[in-house]
Amino acid sequence: MEVNVFEPKNIYEKILEHTNKHGLKDKRLCFNLTGGTKMMFLAGLKASEYFQAPYFYIEEKAQRLLFFKNPSSIESFAIPAIPIKDVETFFSLHVPNRMIKQNGIIDEKSLEKIQERKNLSNLLYEHRARIIPLYQKINNNYAKDKTINICENNMRMFYRDHQVFVNIDGKEINLKYSENEDDFRDYIIGGWLEEYIYCELLELLDKQVIYDLRLNMRLSVESMTATQGGKRPIYAELDIAFSDSKNLYVVECKSGELKNKGVLTALSTNTQIFGGANAKCILVASDTDILSQNIQERIKNLNIKLISRDFKKNIENY
């Protein structure tokens, strides 16, 4: 049932329309008021009153279900913890109307390619303070003729026809970039950090500290598109996602300067939409120096975990 998630009147009318259409008015109804927006909660509450039907609410953090037969009768039931190791199970629970454009599963062939670039990703991370200020220059270089030729500050970076050459302070890397050419630009101006973090987390995956590690997922929910009033689906992009068997974790990787607070709002909102109230969102920043004081306050207010060093250790302990 498609609704405008921020218009309680629209939601309420859609519920009545749905029940009438399917002949549910005289059936025994019970409303689940868990999740969604506050407007959805209020509309569901009003609908339950209209039908004089009970409703329930699941407190995820307390692991209990609150059942309301009427406003004066509340029963509480403990919910046994069931391990959820599959990322998409969280999506099924919280957004059954999801659409997955890119599932983020790294197959053996893709993993080999990431491993081939691992030394380059490590080198870029090691010298990130010198690389990041060159992002715009690299982008402009590539835009001209799909080549990159940078030589400054004891650093050489060259790219043409899938051939990559990087030399920083005498440390040299030659490799053939086997992906789509346009993907290399995305990689060199920030995608390397996503791959760097992914490789860091592989050890936690092997130790079964985390499960179902995904990279670069793209998802959409019908209500997200309906809210924007568009026909084309609006996709949420998750840089990295995984489970610890209890909660969904969503990681946003940022190597360059972060100016747009909307990125943080989207991270927080998408994490709760796809993983529920207990889902955890992490911002991985290559350095806290790229974050202004206002941005850092926003991160704190949105309950986002900021990690800028010892990534594997800090993520494991979060």
Predicted feature residues:
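Long, low-complexity, Lys/Arg-enriched
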Residues: M1-R28, L42-A236, K246-N247, G256-Y318
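Gly/Ser/Thr-rich loops at beta-strand to alpha-helix junctions
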Residues: N32-A43
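Anionic group-transfer/hydrolysis microenvironments
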Residues: T34, D239-A241, K254
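Active-site beta-strand-loop-beta-strand hairpin of nuclease catalytic cores
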Residues: A241-V250
